[in-house]
């Protein structure tokens, strides 16, 4: 039986998880669980969580979710947030205080898609 060599590239080894749901159960039982495992288990070299839409408000109100995100950040997950969404909910400053990279996300997400980065949406 032959051995297949797999050569990874930056885009093959990058995962972007777009989290838009305001449902804390979706965050805990799907979004955060997979995102954190992907980084801890080295399924991807780079893992980024993008906070977009109603999730921006939820994360500023839920201490349990905040701790889970801090744990992910500690383990190397990068966290970005949509500035327009954060401003809609009045939480941009809070997200920045949590260490999130709060910025306009339309162009970066489009760039991720064009470059072939793996993207999941919850």
Predicted regions and their residues:
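Histidine-anchored nucleotide/phosphate-binding helix
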Residues: 28-41
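Short, glycine-rich nucleotide/cofactor-binding loops
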Residues: 16-31, 54-60
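A glycine-rich helix N-cap at a beta->alpha junction
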Residues: 63-92
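N-terminal beta1-alpha1-beta2 submodule of the flavodoxin-like/Rossmannoid cofactor-binding fold
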Residues: 4, 11, 49, 57-61
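A short aromatic-anchored loop/beta-hairpin motif
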Residues: 71, 80, 96-111, 117-118
């Amino acid at each position: 039986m032959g051995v297949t060599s797999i050569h990874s590239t930056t885009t093959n080894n990058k995962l972007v998880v777009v989290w838009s749901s305001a449902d804390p159960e979706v965050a805990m039982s799907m979004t955060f669980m997979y995102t954190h495992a992907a980084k801890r288990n080295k399924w991807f070299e780079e893992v980024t969580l993008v906070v977009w839409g109603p999730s921006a408000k939820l994360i500023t109100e839920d201490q349990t979710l905040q701790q889970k995100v801090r744990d992910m950040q500690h383990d190397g997950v990068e966290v970005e947030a949509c500035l327009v969404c954060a401003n809609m909910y009045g939480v941009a400053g809070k997200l920045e205080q949590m260490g999130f990279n709060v910025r306009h996300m339309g162009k970066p997400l489009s760039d991720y898609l064009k470059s072939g980065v793996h993207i999941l949406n919850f």
